[in-house]
């Protein structure tokens, strides 16, 4: 999707309901950031991991090894949740923001409706599988677009590494972003670094497959790409190709090589001459655009043909 205009460049099954895995955390962080902006909570608040923060975890679920009773700042819990994809951190954040996980999940669903989502229902703040926890690519775009409009959200999801100071129960730890597009040392997804990429979030469960929301910008063209249900395919060298990343890179490289900013009309273009009756200084006025109007469009043909048709309406 072209982030400058909201124009869909390519889509496939964008309204199919699927499990989002940890892409859920985009909504979780959005609600946390909005709570900070309202002044309901503060980044430097001291927050304690409550007794049941690990209660709904499953074996192998991503975590930041947060211990019950451990205290750190609210900001550090946000970094744990987003760049380390720590599920227990999401529970702590939800409890702190809304008083209970159930109240937070209710707020997630309300916010999704406010953003125009029609195929989404959340059942938890982290994305571990539940039958009634689903979304669509279109809805994830709506949620992510709103989230990226908040500076704090954009900063956190684009952070490659973050250091959490020593706590009452743990030594200092360095969190490493799971997104291999922006972190060449990603704990899971190496070999996909892309210089034009920025956050947003990785996700994986057996039910959801490999999922990725990301953005990239080149020559003023800003794109958002969402891949859901990617496969993990063994390579001959013993490594794994993760479809969420390889498909994303294929999409970015294709769009950036075939699309670009094109001037629809230029401020110097003469649109027409409009007759003026009884004019003091002439019998017509020249109509030109107040400014150049551009859009992201397919590149011109080799002969320079514009590949689009201009239609100008005078009011």
Predicted regions located by residue number:
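Domain-terminus/edge residues, biased toward the C-terminal soluble/receptor-binding domains
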Residues: 117-118, 132-134, 138-315
